[in-house]
């Protein structure tokens, strides 16, 4: 077989034995060569064998030798190739031992490699366990922190819910107030409606916002900035909302100069029609253009009388205030012309007409005076008036305020603030009436004392006239005089004797003679005492009945609480959360406080009414005697 074939090149080991046999056969037939040539070939073969052994060791298998080089292919054709194959067979035992050793080593290495992953796996598991043990406290800490965070989050949620509820309640209150402002406003309506909805309770028929602004500006007439600077818009809108919602309190919400000026101008600007009315404003303009001053004043007076009363009153207050501003021209640098330039557009009139009205205002409104407004008393007021006249004026103010509250509540604008204000006004009215009644009683007593002192005869003169005797009477007539004096003394004793009284069999009252000045007073006191004792007995009976009712309700409550606990245990129903309990408790505490206040007010009113009934009963029973 040709060694140069591709099969020989690809698989040299398969054809090595056949080549060796062929070479051995040829070697016997060939002639002997020289020794030098043999020795050189042997050396070459030995070197090649060593190379082949080293290559076999490196490759790790002995059955197949490495690929033959081109030199080996040439040498296989030589006659001495049989010796080479025999030497290769002799060295196979050593190579086998080496191969076995290498195999043992490889097996040991493989076993060791197999054992190493198992050991390393165990070590890793131990390390993981240790890490888990180490991580357990950390995990616990993390869980505790997470729980704390959850608790904080729950608390925040509860607070947020409470804040939302409070905000909702505030929104509800503000919504109710906004409904009042939208449905019953003061700004942007006619003068009559504004006066009715925000009246001054001292009898002046102008809106309260105009009165407050004018009262404040009257104290700052000398200020140079009056009607010249603009306020902060948010502050102006805040005061507008307060007056629309009837919440303005002069003690809390204090005006300043720019706000007072702009608030007055805002009210006048937002009027739906001019202050002089749309029907008469053209005639006012015609009169203002009249050249004669005297005829101008008379015609203006006639036109003013045709205005509605509330429009005329408001115009009078505004013009008199502007006149007071002009009178301080030396300080505020404002005269009639400059003030008319500033405010005539606000009043919806021409500059000429406003100047004419300012010139004649003192004559046109001679009966009007700018009086500072004193609001009605409130619960925070220090004390009640001390004189009957002041009490009567305050009663008129409180009655006016009460009628205004009733009209607003009848229109459907009912809020808790309105209810509290209603009870407060009623309480103040009862206190004022009680104090006025005490003054009236004192006046009646003083009048009775004056009448009794004027109608009583002088006692000394009667005694002198009875005891006087003639100077020249004889001594024999002494017995007659004594006998005549005895009946006189008998007739005087019934008048002066303190025990001269009678007892009424039906009532048991002590009755003095009709001529006695203390008869009526004593009888009045006895009747009043009798009425008060009846009231006391009635109250005692009611107290006993109330105590019995309380005892009955306590027993009923205990039975119902036991039944409800048993029912809840049987059903196993869960109680509502604490937030709901807190909300319910807050709601009912507020309601109870309001009801307690109402109860106290009603109790005081009932007491006053009962006292008035007793006084009337006393007067009726006095008529029987």
Swiss-Prot record:
Residue span(s) of domain Rho-GAP: 191-385
Any GO BP: receptor-mediated endocytosis
Renumbered residue ranges of the record's region Disordered: 1-172, 443-500
UniProt cross-references to Pfam families, sorted A to Z: RhoGAP, RLIP76_Ral-bd
Key words of the record: Developmental protein, GTPase activation, Phosphoprotein, Repeat
InterPro entries named in the record: RALBP1 (IPR039767), RalBP1-like_Ral-bd (IPR049041), Rho_GTPase_activation_prot (IPR008936), RhoGAP_dom (IPR000198)
Top-level taxon in the UniProt lineage: Eukaryota
Listed result of changing residue 229 to V: In RNA edited version
GO cellular component assignments: membrane
Coiled coil as UniProt keyword: no
Site (Arginine finger): 228
Biased composition (Polar residues): 475-484
Residue positions, PTM Phosphoserine: 68-69
GO MF term set: GTPase activator activity; small GTPase binding
Subunit structure: Interacts with CycB and numb.
Listed name of the protein: RalA-binding protein 1
